């Protein structure tokens, strides 16, 4: 059987009907040993313009030529993925192209500005890198391509902010980011692959795997309350016991602590509530 069939719902009374009929007939006469022609079926939606399916007869077709000329084919490709869930119809809007175009330029600039810095790996950057691998991989596997693109934007912003804070990005993170974006912006991916000093095609590279250890939380945020009202938030080591967390919370409150403490409540990993008079 075919691993994946991608087609619009309009094929249900044509290709799919014929394919299933022939497959079941061949199975019945013992020629094949499977009864369905496709392991997985994905019906994509249609791109619409002015509320109607794009059609030459309706005169609402958008030619990609000018868009490719002005923004590049990677921007057009990524915007098509970003416009909405692939299984639903989506309304085309040329203005949305600008945001994707700006993102690709920011991404390119980020890699180029950091490729020669030889900055060492940090735990914080390693965590962001692995979070990005996890999100992009999971969303790609489930065909959630619109959230893949939004995920690139969100994670790139986080990595950019951290790079400014710590002074650079390590080479492995740059390599990983380039590999991740390549299926969605192949021309930029290939160019950046060469610019960071890699040989051959980026599409011969191995897809990165998540390091689960890098994703483990080392700190937790605790909400500190007095008589049920939020007064502060603290970040503490995840290994701290109840008494240590309460002690840290009381230290944070300082002179705001009640004179007479009646009770100290700790909800593990979430809240410290000091009850007093």
What is each of the regions a protein language model found here?
Residues 257-277:
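Cysteine/selenocysteine-centered motifs that mediate thiol-based redox chemistry or coordinate metal-sulfur cofactors
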Residues 27-33, 254-261:
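Active-site phosphate-binding and catalytic loops of NTP-dependent enzymes
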Residues 38-40, 60, 215-217, 256-258:
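Short solvent-exposed loop/turn micro-motifs enriched in small/polar/acidic residues
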Residues 17, 34, 66-235, 265-270:
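Helix-rich, typically C-terminal accessory recognition domains appended to large enzymatic cores
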Residues 59, 235-237, 277:
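Residue-level structural signal for beta-strand termini and adjacent loop
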Residues 1-86:
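Alpha-helical recognition segments enriched in aromatics with Gly/Pro capping
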């Amino acid at each position: 059987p075919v691993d994946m069939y991608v087609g619009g719902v309009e094929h249900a009374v044509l290709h799919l009907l014929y394919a299933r009929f022939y497959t079941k007939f061949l199975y019945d006469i013992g020629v094949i040993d499977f009864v369905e022609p496709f392991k997985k079926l994905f019906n994509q939606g249609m791109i619409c313009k002015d509320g109607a399916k794009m059609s030459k007869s309706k005169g609402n077709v958008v030619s990609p030529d000018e868009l490719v000329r002005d923004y590049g084919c990677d921007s057009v490709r990524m915007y098509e993925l970003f416009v909405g869930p692939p299984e639903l119809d989506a309304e085309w809007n040329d203005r949305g192209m600008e945001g994707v175009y700006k993102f690709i330029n920011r991404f390119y600039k980020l890699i180029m500005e950091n490729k020669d810095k030889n900055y060492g790996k940090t735990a914080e950057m390693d965590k962001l890198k692995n979070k990005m691998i996890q999100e992009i991989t999971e969303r790609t596997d489930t065909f959630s391509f619109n959230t893949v693109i939004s995920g690139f934007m969100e994670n790139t912003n986080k990595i950019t902010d951290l790079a400014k804070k710590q002074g650079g990005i390590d080479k492995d993170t740059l390599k990983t980011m380039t590999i991740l974006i390549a299926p969605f912006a192949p021309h930029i991916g290939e160019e950046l692959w060469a610019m960071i000093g890699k040989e051959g095609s980026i599409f011969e590279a191995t897809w990165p795997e998540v390091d689960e250890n890098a994703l483990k939380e080392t700190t937790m945020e605790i909400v500190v309350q007095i008589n049920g009202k939020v007064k502060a938030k603290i970040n503490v080591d995840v290994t701290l016991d109840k008494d240590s967390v309460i002690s840290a919370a009381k230290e944070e409150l300082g002179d705001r602590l009640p004179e007479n403490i009646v009770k100290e409540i700790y909800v593990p990993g979430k809240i410290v509530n000091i009850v007093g008079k």
